[in-house]
Amino acid sequence: MAKVTANDLLEKFQFELLAGEEGIYRPITTSDISRPGIEMAGFFTYYPARRLQLIGRTELSFLKSLSDQEKEERMTKLCTYDTPGIILSRGLEAPEQLIAAADKRGVPVLRSTLTTTQLSSRVTNFLESELAPVTAVHGVLVDIYGIGVLITGGSGVGKSETALDLVRRGHRLVADDSVEIRQQNEDTLVGYPPPLLQHLLEIRGLGIINVMTLFGAGAVRPFKRISLCMNLELWDQTKAYDRLGLEEDKMKIFDTEITKMTVPVRPGRNLAVIIEVAAMNFRLKRLGFNAAQEFSERLTQVIEHGENEF
């Protein structure tokens, strides 16, 4: 899991640092954000100290109604050595008791001009993306008609050459050779290129080429949600390959399953066209049109009625 700190939030969202500078590199370990409303009332029994604390106009309005002693007590309990940071929304002024407690415990206090709802949404999305579990898969990721297609297979089977052909046909390259995959939600896998390999494609006999330089900015993407896996393998005459498309294999990455198709490779087969059509057919299936199922139903009707013509 990647490491995220309050300093990353400062750089990403241009927050203002009000206090607790010595704690800006304290790790944030969860994407959950807490609004300490009940804690302002003095109830800290279930206080989630390891979360970012988001304070808005409601919390500060209640805090102003307390005595100075109560303010100091609540802010001292709010700022623990485990708290990764406190964020104030709407450009609100930080109470002096909060500043003092934060400096004492090294809790970064940040301020933003965004509303509380906007701030919560943006920070949560950022943390979910950065803290998502990550794995690397050997393959190529291409955006084909809006479908993120992960092309896998053994070394030398033709993954990069197929990707190059797809780029020439107007599709967009995301990553070649190594694809970093993050599970951002239970059913969402997003692929990224390693920074070192971004926009690069390796073609045996040709070397490394820069796809963006050769084909333009429209030929690449920085990331893409993965929906389909196309596995390339050398043609095995002893193996029975699916010819109807009724069966659907799955590939599991983390807790998410995606559709997987196996494409046998041998001379004369245009893999780019096959994968392109597979992506279009996958989109049709998601819209409710299944050619294989329709053919199967027609065949069943013919058999049942004893007809001899299709």
UniProtKB/Swiss-Prot annotation:
Region (Important for the catalytic mechanism of both phosphorylation and dephosphorylation): 201-210
Protein's GO biological process: regulation of carbohydrate metabolic process
Entry's Gene Ontology molecular function annotations: ATP binding; magnesium ion binding; phosphorelay sensor kinase activity; protein serine/threonine kinase activity; protein serine/threonine/tyrosine kinase activity
Region (Important for the catalytic mechanism of dephosphorylation): 264-269
Protein name: HPr kinase/phosphorylase
InterPro entries in UniProt: HPr(Ser)_kin/Pase, Hpr_kin/Pase_C, Hpr_kin/Pase_Hpr_N, P-loop_NTPase, Ser_kin/Pase_Hpr-like_N_sf
First-level EC class: transferase
Natural source organism: Shouchella clausii (strain KSM-K16)
Binding site for Mg(2+): 160, 202
Active site, UniProt feature: 138, 159, 177 (proton acceptor), 243
Keywords: ATP-binding, Carbohydrate metabolism, Kinase, Magnesium, Metal-binding, Multifunctional enzyme, Nucleotide-binding, Serine/threonine-protein kinase, Transferase
Reaction catalysed by this enzyme: [HPr protein]-L-serine + ATP = [HPr protein]-O-phospho-L-serine + ADP + H(+); [HPr protein]-O-phospho-L-serine + phosphate + H(+) = [HPr protein]-L-serine + diphosphate
PANTHER family hit by this protein: HPR KINASE_PHOSPHORYLASE, PROTEIN YJDM-RELATED
Assigned EC number: 2.7.11.-, 2.7.4.-
Domain notes: The Walker A ATP-binding motif also binds Pi and PPi.
Extra remark: Both phosphorylation and phosphorolysis are carried out by the same active site and suggest a common mechanism for both reactions.
Membership in a protein family: Belongs to the HPrK/P family.
Annotated binding of ATP, by residue: 153-160
